[in-house]
Amino acid sequence: MAHLKINGLVQIRSTNRSKHTRASQWKEAVIEIVERKQKVNLVVSFKLEERRRVFQLGDNVTGVVVSGELGLYHLDLTLRDDTSLLIDKLSSADVEHLKSFLDSSTPCESQQPMEPMSSQDDLESSDPFCGEHQEAACGSLNTTPESGTPLSRKMPLSMSNTTGGQKRGEKQGRKRKTEPSSSSAEVNKDIPKENTPDQKKKSRRYYSRNRGGKAEKAVTLREQEKRSNWKLEPAFNSKSYGRANLDGTILPIATCSDDRDVSIFGLEIITHNGVQSLPDPYLNQLKREGFPNLGNTCYMNSILQSVFGIPTFAKDLLTQGIPWEKVSYDDLIMPLSQLLVLKDIRDVEIKGELLTSVKKSISTVADTFSGNEQNDAHEFLSLCLDQLKLNMEKVNAMWDTERRNTCAGSAGTKRFVCPVGANFEFELHSSIICEGCGEATIKTEVSNYLSIDLHHGTKTHPLSIQKSFDLFFTPEKIEHNCEKCKNKNSVLKYTLRRLPRVLIVHLKRYQVTTDLLPVKSEQPVEISKYLNISSHCHENRKLPFPLANTSPDVSQGMMPGIFNQSMLSKKVISESCDPMVLQVGSSVDAEIQSFQIMYEDEDASEEQQQRGLESGSMLEPELVKTENRILRQKTSLATDSMMGDGYSFLPMLCEPLSIQDPGLAEMGLQEVPENPEFKNYEKINIYGKSDGRTNTELSKLYQNHGSRIKGLFLPASLASVSSQEDPEKDLSRSPELQEDDPHSFAFGSDDSKDGEMGDDLQNYRLVSVVSHFGSSPNSGHYVSDVYDFQKQAWLLYSDVQVFESSDPSIQENRLNSGYIFFYMHNEIFEELLKKASECKVLSTSKEEKRDIDYFSTLLNGLTYILEEF
């Protein structure tokens, strides 16, 4: 038998005499299948521990279940002694090979079973075990546990509605219901099939200790690496607050707890040769990574991705010159800003530490977020915005006090704009008019979101976000004691007095039953692409804050100020065209700081960058805290995990930088000419002189004879590197990405009016949707669809995984799950879209930039020598 060796995440489970299941931690390991003395063994060698475990295969195997979702697969191997070996995060090729080896090593079922033989070179006594256990795989190797239908030994990868012994789902005070996966079974996710008595018994056995049936496991961050061909790094153990409440248990493995909703991301299940499998999805998984799940924190990840996807919010938070050295790390604004800067790096450990700090900050005001339980995304959003607003008030108060003490008698002091108030805050004007005397009671409320009721629609008039929004502003008769005439009949009417840049609409999908239990309504609601609010505005309405036409003041708020020196001295490189992402490094091809990417020459020497970082800010010891220890230590690892595909949320700042602080000039920043057509290829020659004419000729020379020059001058190491494909070519090939096509999305019935609504000043356009899959706020899974301005396409964020939809259909896939909707003012949307189209300075790939850098230095030097002669 050929030798097989693959990498994966492994968990070993065993059942003791008391029928209690013990499960080890998930660990990175090398899985090998070897044949010794006519016996086939599976050897698990743990990477971080000098030990291994050996499991005999053959007739010792009682069940093999392969399952997966969105390109990731896991295999559940069950042995006769009730030991289960779970191998997760496998690629399709690895799981095919492993399944083939396991099938070929299993004797015919007609043979007499032998006694279970499971040996090990080293006991796993050091592993902490937990009381939680997922369903084990039962049945023969070639039989699906659900239906008993024989499968071919060379069967394709199974993508059944249930995951076999590893059923993914939630438990809401009822027994599990599974669906058969045989070819004769019709896939119907709305009608769950009943379990057989044996299956029910096993479900009770393995889920009796499930605390609330949480939707996701408390995982180490490295478990969420997407591909096995990526190098697996040591697992990061995130801090867990309130862990004592878990009673020594871990949560079951799942990413979605709704056992009925199989294709939650719009993936259809097809039947092929009697086995349900996954077709090529329309979702294109990107190399970029989202936020790791710390254990039921998908609600936090989805909200943060949606908020970070608002370019104006990012600009207001990062470009005002906030004195970060004065901000406490315990305040939410600090880890939130750091996370925004580093959102697109691949190192999940750094992002995991920052997410833990964000969670801890929110937990100080709401204990419900201190544990590992699933929480409501809307509640987290509300608390997050409130805390951020309070932090900005604290910064302004501190800044005013300091300026008054240092600049006594000055005319005025600078106040920082609150990103929450400038982007999400609106004024809701309510008037209660007495029907008897006409006396009006006026009140104005300030809010960050609008919660609307979920009404019932009909087949002929289906419910939509627009219709629900209109119903909220419909005058309503209420009982109100009039102080003037004592009449109790009044009319309540709402109007919008001040409009926000981004209107957050919260759809009330949860209702409380008579037993005081929250129940989610899955009533379909069509998602309106445009939201027309013109008829609901006050006569003296105030338009949203316009986009600032002046250059941002980065004299004190440049990105290095958010981090301490020890962290910045290490390499933090995010290969992203995100203008807000910190890009610091000493390598030859590392770009300069994030804002320089759009305004400045793309190159800076290592000495210039390091000097700039050291002079950027002298942070107080307040930032050098224990909570930031791992962040500082692990920053150097970000170089190896940098972004490769260069997607971003928007280079929204295209105007030249206005440098006001002389100290900033020492950071290697120079003012860019105001000509927007100025080429980004201008370099600094080796003698420190800038020659625009030479660099223009360099650009033409490289464009016309680039391939020939590469062969003549490039070292072998560089010449052998093939250039990556220009991202702009992808845009030219994809008509739907070239322009903002109002008909490129399959939205609801309101879209017939989209063309007429587009130019209305009171129209808002959808830019993000947070969806919940599940039947309870305490379980399920949250995802977020965010419009990417740079790519001009929709991106789906599901924790660490990021997908691009080539043919988006948000209306179809979020019909029953859409929960929170972000609508941007159409005028601002168009302006940001225009700026994003103009900002194309990062269209060159990493290898092409390296080549240009090399030629720039070489040819500039040659030009200088020729001029001297």
Swiss-Prot record:
Compositional bias ranges of the Basic residues kind: 201-212
GO CC, alphabetical: perinuclear region of cytoplasm
Record EC number: 3.4.19.12
Tissue expression as described in the entry: Predominantly expressed in brain and testis. Highest expression levels in adult brain, especially in the cerebral cortex and hippocampus, and in the forebrain, face, and limb buds of midgestation mouse embryos.
Molecular-function GO term, any one: cysteine-type endopeptidase activity
Compositional bias (Polar residues): 104-120, 140-150
Compartments where located: Cytoplasm, Perinuclear region
InterPro entries for the chain: Papain-like_cys_pep_sf, Peptidase_C19, Peptidase_C19_UCH, USP37-like_PH, USP37-like_PH_sf, USP_CS, USP_dom
Source species, domain of life: Eukaryota
GO biological process, one term: innate immune response
Recorded phenotype for the gene knockout or disruption: No visible phenotype in normal conditions.
Gene3D superfamilies listed in its UniProt record: Cysteine proteinases, Ubiquitin carboxyl-terminal hydrolase 26/29/37, pleckstrin homology-like domain
Key word Protease present: yes
Free-text function comment from the UniProt entry: Deubiquitinase involved in innate antiviral immunity by mediating 'Lys-48'-linked deubiquitination of CGAS, thereby promoting its stabilization.
Similarity comment: Belongs to the peptidase C19 family.
Identification of the protein by name: Ubiquitin carboxyl-terminal hydrolase 29
Classification lineage: Eukaryota, Metazoa, Chordata, Craniata, Vertebrata
